[in-house]
Amino acid sequence: IWDDHEITNDAWQNGAQNHTEGAEGAWVDRVNVGLQAYYEWMPVRVPDRSMPRRNQRAFAFGDLIDLAMLEERLSARSQQLPATIPIPGLGNAFAQVGEFTNPARTLLGNEQEAWLAQRLRTSDARWKFIGQGVMFAQLKAQGAPLSAGGGLFFNSDQWDGYQPARDRIYNVLKGDATNAAVNNCVILTGDIHSSWAADLSQDPNNPDTASGGYDAATGVGSHAVEFVGTSVSSPGLDDPQGNTARFLRSVNPHF
């Protein structure tokens, strides 16, 4: 699956963080030529030539793994919202309030969300893998349980910037009155040039598992796991002493 830089940085359905309409041409033209180059040079099939942006697809590896690959950039993604709360030494962060809580905001779009839910709920494979582009786990600059506002988040380009959409995926994983919970789900991610592993909890800073929280010692409260793979040659976090990793673990116990 493509990253945003096959077109330009932090792309969404109708634009990007560093695309200026007119001065840099038309967004539609930029997407079309970028995807043409991608499909011509990458060893991947074009799922639908009439809709080149729509490249979500699935693979079955016997009864061992069912792999769903998601498209999160160009088909339906809502525009990223800005992070406007300054954190000394860390840059800007944001709280999940206001427009961040709008359920209409999406990474996948209604059609792809329904497709993913159906695949997860009906898969007979032992493992359900999801390959996708941006970190699903919460990544906080300040930790707090949901009952206290949830804390502050670093990156609104990730699923943190689309909390209602992420909750809809969690609802599929947890199951409901008519659908069983989805077990053995693993999310595989790229994007941020560094390696991470996380339990996936909706409320990781809440230690009370009875109220939907998460126990880092036992993993109770985790509904899936995520592995984020590093880049091949692009630089990642410069953290030779491990200070950044220690800080992040202190406010993100699910890592």
Positions of the model-derived regions?
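Long, structured stretches of catalytic cores involved in phosphate-ester chemistry, encompassing
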Residues: I1-F255
